[in-house]
Design a protein with these regions (language model features):
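Short secondary-structure transition/capping segments
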Residues: 1-13, 65-66, 89-101, 105-106
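Helix-loop-strand module that forms the ligand-binding subsite of alpha/beta enzymes
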Residues: 2-78
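Glycine-rich phosphate/pyrophosphate-binding loop and the adjoining helix
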Residues: 74-125
Length: 125
């Protein structure tokens, strides 16, 4: 299973990751998947000057739903961005659907705006 996740990841040109923010972290299943695709010799390599990502030519879109408003400064979204940068991905985008718990009366509006942003991103993704 470990190698099948890695191989599946390597075969894709575009990756979309969608997750909730849980206690300032990502869900455990997403963490497990990231651990499976972070493989020395497959997605990064060791060099004399340190680790180097070898994943090239992929587009990654990370969509995260947050009850509060963090503007991309939460540890979970930073972790996801850091991992894919580490792997060598340079075409990385994030979309945040946030504030639904903070402003429940605006939840429909928040989701509508996020869908509009996603539609705009889809044009170039």
């Amino acid at each position: 299973m470990f190698n099948s996740y890695t191989e599946d990841f390597l075969q894709q040109d575009k990756i979309i990751i969608a997750n909730p923010l849980w206690n300032l972290s990502i869900p455990t299943r997403l963490k497990a998947w990231i651990d499976c695709i972070t493989v020395a010799g497959k997605t990064f390599k060791y060099t004399e000057t340190g680790s180097v990502g070898i994943v090239k030519g992929k587009k990654v879109l990370h969509i995260q739903a947050n009850g509060g408003v963090y503007n991309g400064s939460d540890p979970a979204s930073q972790y996801v961005k850091t991992i894919f940068t580490f792997l060598g991905v340079t075409d990385f985008h994030q979309l945040f659907v946030e504030g639904m718990d903070h402003n429940p009366e605006k939840a429909d509006e928040i989701v509508k705006k996020a869908v509009e942003k996603a539609q705009q991103l889809a044009k170039t993704f």
